[in-house]
Amino acid sequence: MFDLRTAARDVGFFYLSGHGITQPEIDAVMGAARGFFALPEADKLAIEMVKSPQFRGYTRAGGELTRGRADWREQLDIGVERATIAQGPGVPAWTRLQGPNQWPAALPDLKPALLGWQAKATDVAIRLLKAFALSLDQPEDAFDAIYRSEPNHRMKIVRYPGRDTTGDDQGVGAHKDGGFLTLLLQDENKGLQVEYDGSWVDVDPIPQTLVVNIGELLELASNGYLRATVHRVVTPPAGIERISVPFFFSARLDATVPLLDLPEELAAEARGPASDPDNPLFRNVGTNVLKSRLRSHPDVARRHYADLLEKASAAS
């Protein structure tokens, strides 16, 4: 437990082996991802994210923003399959995030492949979260109440196309992840980098491992004892593509992130969550998630959340 806590606090990233997911299962989800990206563009655009108020679906390269700059990657976002929530006066805007995924008609095997991976990754993440609770001298079930009944998991399949040096190598810009934990499956091509002691450190792929990093919810819950680490992805050179499958384990949208009562020796090292004036953190999970989605996908925001944009503009 000490090693887990130290890795999470000092770096915020670590490799996980012995996770229980088999190599054939890894190969299957990677094959499904490659199969999707090989589809004709028209098939992918038929499920473009802009059609989904839940921010689910396909985004072409350059279609997502990180800190206002375009990310050079194409991707498919999916979440937990649930019915939409009826809207009306007094219903929080973040309830619009709940709903169905979009799936390509041309690739019917993709849905069971990705939902199956989501289930496997969820099992791993829950075991890890319980271990983190114990490492912080908390009950094993310390977080159960805020994710148990309707967790808000999200995952992507991502392709980073190679390109010639242009002066902009942003595959995805520097950022922190917003959930509890991220479990990343990556192919053999490097590109992920973690900010550590003011420098960017490569997170090279290691076969049969997942890369785990701390999200902002754990940073909030531990009052900053555990840190969500800034990371980015650098675009591969021309002629090379990089495939990854990130899974974001989070809480119920209606949950409020608790502040853990840490033991004295840990509390003394908890300096509060890192503050970014351009990206404030909220303890209400739904508010946090919606804020992040609106910033990253302005086209979806304009189509499905124009009322919120108008209110924000009027208040500014």
Across the structure, where does each feature detected by a protein language model lie?
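C-terminal flanking tails of non-heme Fe-dependent oxygenases
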Residues: 1-67, 72, 120-316
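Non-heme Fe(II)/2-oxoglutarate
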Residues: 7-10, 18-22, 72-129, 135
